[in-house]
């Protein structure tokens, strides 16, 4: 008897969809729905707050802080220079972002004229030399400085694969370990930013400003493995 492969494929697809639905997979939503408040407020400028570091890796804070400027600018936002911002915040004894994440952000709107403040919380940061991996977990919270409403909130749990492939298994292990050990800390931060900020709606200075509302929003919590 001739097998109807199209019918079989359709049946498998429908069965898989049913399984995913029964496991609680949420239906996709548009960016306009996921980030309704951001589209409503249309922030033009962003103040990047010093990261909140929950790990024992002191270097993680600087790496994340230094890696956020360019991705936000490329998304069409005016971003206050992190270096100047940090100096100003330190002069006002305001460089501890943890103090402000749940407090009023109006002073940042009045003093710095920033429309929004970006908080990042570093939850995991470690290198595993033998596995040639860098593991990074960061939460991103963009809040309005006018009314403290959350405009964008996502988290990334990223494993950066630094492995190197040769024709020798032992050499692979050694070279990969060295590659991981020498990897700049900023590599992990950049990969996490890539995962999360690519889903941020475009700002006024980007070509798709207010044209990306119908695009499907990415998941709130992203986990994955990327090559270095």
Per-range role (PLM):
Residues 2-12:
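Bacterial N-terminal signal peptides that target proteins for export
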Residues 19-22:
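C-terminal motif of bacterial Sec signal peptides marking the signal peptidase cleavage site
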Residues 24-42, 146-228:
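C-terminal/domain-edge helix-coil "capping" segments
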Residues 43, 55-119, 149, 181:
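N-terminal segment of the mature soluble domain
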Residues 53-56, 126:
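Short histidine/acidic/glycine/proline-rich micro-motifs that form metal-
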Residues 96-151, 158-165, 172, 212-228:
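Surface-exposed short loop/turn segments
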